[in-house]
Amino acid sequence: MDQGGRSSGSGGGGAEQGKYRGVRRRPWGKYAAEIRDSRKHGERVWLGTFDTAEDAARAYDRAAYSMRGKAAILNFPHEYNMGTGSSSTAANSSSSSQQVFEFEYLDDSVLDELLEYGENYNKTHNINMGKRQ
């Protein structure tokens, strides 16, 4: 393996299987990305299918950095500022067209407030969200 955690692979050029950590080439030419979650006994976490191996590798890097922080072995470590404790700026440095959203758990009272706000908004603006006839 080289410094970036990539295996050297064998065979011809191009983006052969094993070039990037967490990336596999599908038979039809797309690239699948997944990572194992050590918090869930190595359970596979599906990250998606991508047009390029580099996009799939960046998805893996975002997930790895999110899970493991500075201890993560990345495909593109130079894209992450390892000197800071913030992972949000690291994910933004990627040129990928994919966006990553982090959701925070909020208790049911917040959901109830949001639903009530939506209902009140719809009433004051005469928006009918009922079934169409």
UniProtKB/Swiss-Prot annotation:
Factors inducing expression: Induced by Pseudomonas syringae tomato (both virulent and avirulent avrRpt2 strains). Not affected by methyl jasmonate (MeJA), ethylene or salicylic acid (SA).
GO MF annotation, one: DNA-binding transcription factor activity
Subcellular location as annotated: Nucleus
GO annotation, cellular component aspect: nucleus
DNA-binding region per UniProt: 19-77
Keyword vocabulary terms for this entry: Activator, DNA-binding, Ethylene signaling pathway, Nucleus, Plant defense, Transcription, Transcription regulation
Compositional bias per record (Gly residues), positions renumbered to this chain: 1-16
Region (Disordered): 1-22
Protein's name in the database: Ethylene-responsive transcription factor 14
